[in-house]
Amino acid sequence: TTVTAMVGAMLRKANWNVEVAGNISPAVLNALMHCMDTNHWPQAWALETSSFQLETTAHLNADVATVLNLSEDHLDRYASMQDYTLAKARVFLHEKTGAGIQVLNRDDPAVCAMALTDRKQITFGLGIPPTSIDFGILHEDDDTWLMEGDQRLMKSSELVVHGLHNAANALAALAMCRSVGVSIA
């Protein structure tokens, strides 16, 4: 929910017309019906989808998608972690081969294993970014910096939400926005 809200806020700050929907509310179908009724279509959708919703999704065709982490919190619904992982990975399904960018949490090996060979990947994590297109953290003196490659973006203390988990959320949102062409400055 935090990352979806951050993506929506960042896109709006970049003057994009964006519709934020899904688990975050409103429901995707309600938001879609509103757009149909008003004939007002956004430039972008920022959607939060659950593994439950993805089970019946043939393909999302997202320009960019992410799985933030995998944990055992839904094993009451799934027979195994593998089944849960397969459901979550459906967010990356696309009709066109090679289409859609994957934003992957490099601190979660199970998420990294979702990398598709025909897709571009951008990673985020709580360490120094391994390449110029990846996002991460630099700890320097008493400061913690959010980074894109070797470029310092902002101090984590400047985030409205605090904690390393929220720094990771911000990095994921930054990676998603960058991947669709939003300037980060």
Where is each model-derived feature located?
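Phosphate-binding loop of NTP-binding sites
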Residues: T2-R106, A110-K120, L138
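Adenine nucleotide phosphate-binding catalytic loops in nucleotide-utilizing enzymes
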Residues: S80-Q82, K120-A185
